[in-house]
C-alpha cells in the first residue's frame, strides 16, 4: 500500500496575494494546512544601518520607505525620538497638523488594505472604490510636501511648512474634457483645509458604500467569520498591537493610553472586536476610518481658528527662512552648517512609539553625542503578526490562507527593513 504523507509547497514570493515578497513554506494534509513557516528578508535594504551613516536631518526620508503605505506615521515615530533626545517640543499648531496627517495616513492605509483584502477574497468592486478616495488623500500629501507618497514632511521641531492656500488641480486631457475637469475641481478651489473639510463631509457615506458591498454579504462572511481566530490572551502573548490586538477584544491604543501630538485634545473612540477573526479585523478597521474622519474634522476646525508657527525658532536645529538668509550672514552660516553637517544630538537613548495604522511603530535611537545616530532600531508594527501565521492558519483550508494573510495587513518594507 502506498504511503500517505503530507505535501509541502512554496507560497510566494511571486504570488499576487503575498502582499509583497512573502515566502511561506506550507505543509498540507490534502487541503488542510498543518504547518506554515514564513521566510522573510527578500526586501532587506539595511535601513537601520544606512541611518547610522547620515546626519539626523537626512534620514527622515528612510522612514517613509519602511511601511510605504503609512508614510507620515513612520516619520512621526522617528522625529518624536529625536525630539526626546534634543529636549524640544514642537508648537501646538504643528502638533495638530501632525495629528491630522496621521489620521489621513490611517485612512490611506486602511483603504488600500480594504481594497486588497476584498480583491484577495474575490470582491473586485471594493478595490476600485477605495482607490477613488485614496487619490483625494494623496493630493493632500502632494499639497503640503510636493510628493504623493514619500513626503518627508515631519521634521524635529515641527513640520516642513504651514498648510497651503491652494490645492493641485486636474487639467483637461484625452480622458477628461473641460466640463468634466471643472466638476472634478469644484472642491479644489479653496485651501487645503477647505478640501479636507469637503472630503470628511463626504467620506462617511462612502464608508457606508463599502459596507453595503461587504458587511452583510453572505460570501464575505463565509470567507472571514471564524477564520484565523486569535484570543485576547494569546494576542497579548504574541505581541500583537493595533487593529489586530483590538479585534481580539483588547482595548489598547497608544493615542489614548500614551497620548502624543494633539491626541489628548481630540475626542474619539477605540473600536474593539470580540472574536479575533478576519471578520472582526475588517469591522475594527472600518470603524477606525470613521473615527479618523472624526479626528480630522476636529483638527480642521482648530487649525482654521488658530494660526501660528509650525516650527520652533532655533537655527541650531531648524534652517532659517530664505528671506532671513538674504539679509543676515549668521542665518546663512546656520543654513550651510545644517545642510552639510546637520545638528549635534546630546548623548543618550530614546524610544518613541506611535499608533501607526498597522500597530505600534517604535523607533529606538542611541546617540553618542555626534551628528548621526550611533544605533537606530525600528520596531515594525506588523512583524509579530506575521510571526503568528503558523498559529492562525493551522487547521484551515489553503483558500483561507489568502484571507488570513490579507487580514493581518503586512508590508515588507517595514518587516524586512
Swiss-Prot record:
InterPro entries: NADH_Q_OxRdtase_suD (IPR001135), NADH_UbQ_OxRdtase_49kDa_CS (IPR014029), NDH1_su_D/H (IPR022885), NiFe-Hase_large (IPR029014). It is found in: Cell inner membrane. It is a peripheral membrane protein. This is NADH-quinone oxidoreductase subunit D. Belongs to the complex I 49 kDa subunit family. It is an enzyme of class 7 (translocase). Its main location: membrane. NCBIfam families: NuoD (TIGR01962), PRK06075.1 (NF004739). NDH-1 is composed of 14 different subunits. Subunits NuoB, C, D, E, F, and G constitute the peripheral sector of the complex. The lineage of its organism: Bacteria, Pseudomonadati, Pseudomonadota, Gammaproteobacteria, Legionellales. GO terms for cellular component: plasma membrane. It holds the Pfam family Complex1_49kDa. NDH-1 shuttles electrons from NADH, via FMN and iron-sulfur (Fe-S) centers, to quinones in the respiratory chain. The immediate electron acceptor for the enzyme in this species is believed to be ubiquinone. Couples the redox reaction to proton translocation (for every two electrons transferred, four hydrogen ions are translocated across the cytoplasmic membrane), and thus conserves the redox energy in a proton gradient. Its EC number is 7.1.1.-. It catalyses: a quinone + NADH + 5 H(+)(in) = a quinol + NAD(+) + 4 H(+)(out). Keywords: Cell inner membrane, Cell membrane, Membrane, NAD, Quinone, Translocase, Transport, Ubiquinone. GO terms for molecular function: NAD binding; NADH:ubiquinone reductase (non-electrogenic) activity; quinone binding.
